[in-house]
Amino acid sequence: MITAIVLINTAQGSTAEVAQALIGLPGITEAYSVAGAYDLVAIVRVGDHEKLADLIAGRVQKVSGIVATNTLIAFQAYSQRDLEAMWDIGNDEPIR
């Protein structure tokens, strides 16, 4: 499974419409409006790199209202659950 994070700039006033269009595409599991240099962040999960290329170049970049994209391919996933297990040394007594 390939996971990618797509950073998206949208035309002024089109962020909500772009987000709705994106979440309708197969492979895009989530879309977030964000503050900062980008307007949206989309999370993509697909089976292989060819499907990722088809989705980004063939469908995402053609969504009306998208000005630019920057795609980041994830190498390793970390979550709070993973971090808690990593730092658990087996001592459940509170620190005093």
Describe the function of each predicted region:
Residues 1-96:
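A compositional/biophysical signature of low hydrophobicity enriched in polar/charged and small residues
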